[in-house]
Every structure is written in structure tokens, then in C-alpha cells.
Amino acid sequence: MLDKVKNVIVVLSGKGGVGKSTVSTQLALALRHTGHKVGLLDIDLCGPSVPYLLGLEGSDIYQCDDGWVPIYTDESKTLAVMSIGFLLKSRTDPVIWRGPKKTMMIKQFLQDVKWDELDYLIIDTPPGTSDEHITVMECLREVPCNGAIIVTTPQGVALDDVRKEITFCKKTGIKLLGIVENMSGFVCPHCTTCTNIFSSNGGIELANLAQIPHLGTLPIDPRVGILAGTTASVLSELPESSTAEVLKGLVQHLDTLTAQG
């Protein structure tokens, strides 16, 4: 039930392990920090990370007459979260489902969660281009989906998979809002100097090639990693960091896009 949701943003990655869930989570927290009411929907069925990243593991969800009730991280209900992880007994429990059951569960999460009034719903998807993604796109055709943000790392193998993701989005008709390059450089926790330990600027080059916006470059910052397991935003805890600057720019970019309709 997305009738009370003003804006829907899908976060995609062509490859696993690029930090997509961390970007989704910190984007949701940044939007909340700037005064928005936000929902975060984790439909990465085989690798749900959001409950861990927000310190919500062990939370119980229940159903009311109107559907699933999400987990709220605060009394003001400014951040609502739903994940398959809440239905598992342990983070190590595998989800051994065939395609049709996965499709059914994703449809349930997209159609049967009782969201309150939300300014933004961030949808954290599985990596790749699979049946799950097709199901998401089909369901979102019935609601005003603003578009997709693609997360990548600078390495060539990740960028190759992002090219497939871009093609997938174009074929399924979802608007590409831009690319975020993650894990580009390492920030020393002592002197905050950023050193490129992998290749760099691959996300920028790919964005230029695909003619879509480059939304920012995020480094590996151990200080950001320490925030995992809490609902603390980088914007409040590390306001001077390069990660905070990128997230501020991303929030402003989304606010501008949504204001334009």
C-alpha cells in the first residue's frame, strides 16, 4: 500500500558487495535528518542487511487488518523499516526459496505493508538483474516511482555489471536518477587523508558515457563503519566528512527532482 507515499526511490547495484545497503540506509537516515518522513524497504531476500545496519535485529513485526506494520526507529515515526530479515530467526538463516515464492514475497512487501504518510520510500533491492527486479518494476508501474540510483565501486568488473543494470533500467522503463561511486579511496581515521587504493573515477566515466548524473563519490571511511548497528546519521555524527557532503548533495538532488514533479 503505497498510496500515502509521495516519492519512491529504488537503489540498485549490478554486483553484490558494493555497499548498496549501506548507501540505502545512510540515504534514508540523511533524508530523515533533513526533516523528511522516510520508509526503508529491504527486499534483498537472500541477503537482508538493513536490520543489522540499523541495530534492529530481533525486532518483531506483525500484521493488522490493513497489512504488515513496519518497525519504527523512533517514537515520532520519522523512519519506518520493513525487511525479510525481521521474519528470520537468525541473520545466518538462509532463504531457500524458488523463484515463484520470492516473487510472491516481494509483491507482498510492495503491496501489503501499511506505510503511514511518507515523503520518501527507499527500496533496497538485491544485486543483479533477476526475477526479483522484474517483479519490483512491474509492481512500481502502478505507483509514482521517481527512479533508480545505481551504486557501484571503481573496479572494472563492478562497472561492467553496472552497464547491464543501466540497460535493464532502460528496457524496463525506470528512470535513472544517477550513479553513486562507493568505496573510492580510503580515509585514514587518524589524519582523514584519502588515499586511492583501487582505481578511481570509474563511476564518473560511466555516468558520462551513459549520459546520466554522477551523484557523488564515497570513500571507505572506518568512522562511517562504526555507525553500523545504530540509527545515527553521518550528517549528525560526521558532518564535516566527505561522506556527509555527498549525502547532503544527494538529498538536495532528490528534493529538487521531486519538487519539479
UniProtKB/Swiss-Prot annotation:
Gene3D superfamilies in UniProt: P-loop containing nucleotide triphosphate hydrolases (3.40.50.300)
GO biological process, one term: iron-sulfur cluster assembly
Cofactor(s) essential for the protein: [4Fe-4S] cluster
Pfam families cross-referenced by the UniProt entry: ParA
Keyword Nucleotidyltransferase: no
Record-listed ATP binding positions: G14, K15, G16, G17, V18, G19, K20, S21
Protein localization: Cytoplasm
Source taxon at top rank: Eukaryota
Residues reported to bind [4Fe-4S] cluster: C188, C191
Cofactor note: Binds 4 [4Fe-4S] clusters per heterotetramer. Contains two stable clusters in the N-termini of Nubp1 and two labile, bridging clusters between subunits of the Nubp1-Nubp2 heterotetramer.
UniProt GO molecular function: 4 iron, 4 sulfur cluster binding; ATP binding; ATP-dependent FeS chaperone activity; metal ion binding
Main location: cytoplasm
Keywords from the named record: 4Fe-4S, ATP-binding, Cytoplasm, Iron, Iron-sulfur, Metal-binding, Nucleotide-binding
One Gene Ontology CC term in the entry: cytosol
HAMAP family the UniProt entry points to: Mrp_NBP35 (MF_02040), NUBP2 (MF_03039)
Protein family (similarity comment): Belongs to the Mrp/NBP35 ATP-binding proteins family. NUBP2/CFD1 subfamily.
Assembly, per entry: Heterotetramer of 2 Nubp1 and 2 Nubp2 chains.
Function (record text): Component of the cytosolic iron-sulfur (Fe/S) protein assembly (CIA) machinery. Required for maturation of extramitochondrial Fe-S proteins. The Nubp1-Nubp2 heterotetramer forms a Fe-S scaffold complex, mediating the de novo assembly of an Fe-S cluster and its transfer to target apoproteins.
Protein name: Cytosolic Fe-S cluster assembly factor Nubp2 homolog
Source species of the chain: Drosophila willistoni (Fruit fly)
